[in-house]
Amino acid sequence: MNNLRLQILICKGTGCVSARSDLIKENFDRAIEHYKIKDVEAMITGCFGFCGEGPIVKIEPDNVFYTHVSPDDVNEIVAEHIIHGRPVKRLLYKNPKNKEPIYNQKEMSFYGKQTRVALKNCGKIDPENIDDYISYDGYQALLKVLTEMTPQDVIDLIKASGLRGRGGGGFPTGIKWQNTYNSPGEEKYIFCNADEGDPGAFMDRSILEGDPNSIVEAMTIGGYATGAKHGVVYIRAEYPLAIHRLKTAISQARDYGFLGKNIFNSGFDFDIEIRYGAGAFVCGEETALIHSVEGKRGEPTRKPPFPSVKGYMGKPTTVNNVETYANIPKIILRGTDWFTSMGTEKSKGTKVFALAGKVNNVGLVEVPMGITIREIVYDIGGGIPNGKKFKAVQIGGPSGGMITKENIDTPIDYENLREIGAMMGSGGLIVMDEDNDMVEIAKFYLEFTQDESCGKCTPCRVGTKRLLEMLKNLLDDKGSEDDLQKIEDLCHNIINSAACGLGQTAPNPILSTMKYFPDEYLKYARHEVKRAYKINKDKCIGCHRCARECPVKCISGNPKEKHEINEDKCIACGTCFKTCPVGAVVEPK
């Protein structure tokens, strides 16, 4: 903070920007100038993680955390807190149990069990200012690597740390680097997979928006270790803010000599370019990603050969995702003992999750491997809204599985998740309560993967389409119990014969929900699911038309009053839906 008395940290991640944090920053600058305050600075930061409470403003070193800040609140914060030292209570986060304001971020339950490694600088530094990154030990790991370590030393350190890929399967990062290093040839490449395709996942985007220099530094370290002189970041074009900040970081790194020729006078040359993806989910698979960068169709190829042997332009290529890279500089500087002290025996370090769904606190959480779903949902997430019961967590994105109440205390790591029919994936974590229909959930994810299939292999292209047809028949009251066995058999056939990970894991949500919620499938197969229309009382105008037209007289309510449908008597004929002039009648699922 240099000679500053206070720093005003304003979140400018995508979520807060959409809620006008740009204007919040402008208003703080104007107010500071208006009051002629010389020892206070307003600066932008990346995502704080607590996205459900944004826009967020934090005052340092007071550690006061303001939530739901609007541009109109700025003058009050400056007049009360900055000038007179009185925090604005109405903007503080409220304890959900007693509604008392919490002044200090460290006392908030959302952050209580988090351990920030990959997200360490997000919410602390200005992501568009390389000097800020340097002040937090930025590029010190690169200096150490280039002046004190051989490439094999670096690889051995990453191996010893136990770091595993954070993008899906959890392959050991050090072994992947070793394979590329061992591959013959002078021309090698290192890629960063920033094509974050899971619905609801935004971990990688937030790291690139909040700490882009950490990825530049890590890729340069990886290039040195594997023998690559050229790096490529493959990022989806739908991430304009992340792209802007990554471009800024690369440009500034070149200006400072951290990229380019003879970095730190070591004789090592390395540079990075950005390539854009069009949002295809399948391009998150490393061979499809490489094909896309080469200008080809984004289709996976069978392995071996692996990219570490034959990748981009036929040359050895390393592919890691954003979160994996974000761990590298910290491991280099703090050592393997520090990193291995977090996590479980086979899954070291932390994992970032995008917590969403039926939970009170939504946002990004970074927790040590080995934490339980109960701790994430109830201690960090604040529990289920409206007193509803926990039903399941969907983990691993569209290709993942369910963690139910029976497994809510299972420590989360790669092996444990695999044993219960789920997977780590990139880190999507969707909480579901007693009202969620698990057959509908399975259909939702299958619709996504079926739509995202590249179409190269028949099991995925045709198999997922047939699966979806059978699921829709069940939900439309056209299925039978025989269909359940057909669905399960087709799931296993697709898994065993699809060409790539997308097809091989597409049936996971179906198999997982069939395993843990068989009764819900049986109810549909036996035609026991009651289908009834409902009336949205906020829209109902009491015109009484629906009640007059209903053939079974199951709608109650006098003219000019809110009406209600008796769901036990409703035959789902749709007459009320067609009759209502204001769209107040809601169709059954």
Task: Give the ranges of each region predicted by the language model.
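Conserved phosphate/anionic-ligand binding catalytic regions in large, soluble enzymes, centered on
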Residues: C16, K159-T180, G279-H291, R297, ...
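Flexible inter-domain linker/hinge segments
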Residues: L92-A160, M313, N320-G335
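Iron-sulfur cluster-binding cysteine motifs and their immediate structural context
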Residues: E53-V57, P459-K465, R545-E564, T575-K589
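Ferredoxin-type iron-sulfur electron-transfer modules in oxidoreductases and energy-metabolism complexes
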Residues: M1-Q7, A19-I44, P61-R90, S135, ...
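Short amphipathic, charge-patterned alpha-helical segments
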Residues: A218-T220, M369-P385
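Hydrophobic alpha-helical positions that pack around
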Residues: I243-M369, G381
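Gly-rich Lys/Arg/Thr-decorated short loops/hinges at beta-loop-alpha junctions or inter-strand turns
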Residues: I10, I125-E128, Y133-Q140, I190-D204, ...
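C-terminal accessory/binding modules appended to enzymatic or scaffolding proteins
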Residues: S347-N361, V367-M369, I373, V529-E567, ...
